[in-house]
Amino acid sequence: MNCEATLTEMRYEAPETLDAAIGLIGAETGVAKVFAGGTDVLVQMHLDLIEPDLIVDVKNIAEMREVVEQDGSWRFGAAVTGKELMDNPEFNVAWPGVMDGVRLIGSVQVRGRATVGGNLCNASPAADSVPPMIAADAIASVVGPNGRREVPMA
């Protein structure tokens, strides 16, 4: 049996601030991927669908881990897992339809790792959390090297 593998160099960074993450992504001349739960990125890498030059793990960024009620609205970061949202009783009461969609994401094990932000960003037509977010008039706050913008789900 003949087995051959080609390894390419990949950097992994785990910044602690949003500005640091944006700086890393903005400075990368190759392919950069954001890593929150990893359930999509790792599968895509395993299947050789993507070969990132840089992985930026955002789980250490406080803003990406928050679930916050503010002025009658709720905000949760891109690194919040489905399980973490399910474990937040106040969010469950405020947004039962959104939580119905979150509960449809994968298995119990997947929800413990997968993020709702990743479910949205993956842009899969089968993303379970997207229809309830559209119905709830959710707005994504997208941040990158060119600043922040608010993007309605609808």
Please name every model-derived segment.
Residues M1-A154:
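C-terminal structural segment of proteins
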